[in-house]
Amino acid sequence: MSSTPQPETLPLARLLSRPVLISGAALGLAIVLAWAWLFANPMPMDGLGGPDSMPGMADMPGMEAALDPWSADYLLAAFAMWALMMVAMMLPSAAPMILLHARIDRGTEAQRTRDSFLFILCYLAVWTIFSTFAALTQAALIGGGLLPSHTLALDSSVLAAGLVFAAALWQLTSAKTACLQQCQSPLQFVMRYWRPGAAGAVRLGLRHGLFCLGCCWSLMLLLFVGGVMNLAWIAALALLPFIEKVTPPLWRADRWLAGLLMLGAAALLAF
């Protein structure tokens, strides 16, 4: 049975070897490009221009399909937007796990580089599935008149407060705690679940993605509260999982965040 090499026994040359550098460069490039896209497209994505952005547009011949949130064009644009946001928001907090995997993986440099990319792709595959769900939810909310296409923020303070309160409750569940613990200890996670080869990298990437999803899905849905394309709100929500994952477990950052979310829900109802 193969054993996982201990990171502290690896020479500096291996820690700075090509697979680690390539993984780090790929992560950095993906994060920078995703954030660059968000900054280059700061206006709300309302599907080829919504009725609120151009008065009278909905009355023009042929524009009905363009304004339909269930049209293929709109759903594809919404999915792409959510997928890019998940890359920008979730890859930074996953970077320690991904780089650790690249460091301790065995095999030739080509095999380690391949395994690192498989790990990243499978991790992102989980968030891609979430992005599909989020895009469909967005279309349903717009179609139901609950999410204005020009802001992509919930119109109802009651509904927004309910979503924030639900996220606070999830923070207090044992499932959230279990998922967060897996994300807070990259070394323990890799040592427990690491398997050699491409298949091992695929399983590890999917497993980490699922734990990360269980930890952060409710926070990501809060994008509907402050605005799906509100850059300040996106940055704030991206910071929350990062803080949860890098702070010591004894600090119970998830519990503090639950309290803040409950206060936020109350504020939405009060004001």
Which role fits each region the language model picked out?
Residues 2-83, 107-108, 146-152, 174-195:
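Histidine-/acidic- and/or cysteine-rich, low-complexity loops and terminal segments associated
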Residues 3, 9-13, 78-124:
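Juxtamembrane transmembrane-helix termini in multi-pass membrane transport proteins
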Residues 20-32, 147-173, 253-271:
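Selective transmembrane alpha-helices of multi-pass membrane proteins
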Residues 23, 27, 74-78, 115, ...:
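Residue-level signature of transmembrane alpha-helical entry/exit and packing/kink sites
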Residues 95-105, 172-176, 240-249:
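C-terminal ends of transmembrane helices
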Residues 110-140, 215-250, 256-263:
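A small-residue-rich subset of transmembrane alpha-helices
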Residues 128-143, 147, 158-185:
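Transmembrane alpha-helix/helix-exit interface in multi-pass inner-membrane proteins
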Residues 168-178, 200-228:
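Alpha-helical transmembrane segments of helical membrane proteins, especially in multi-pass transport
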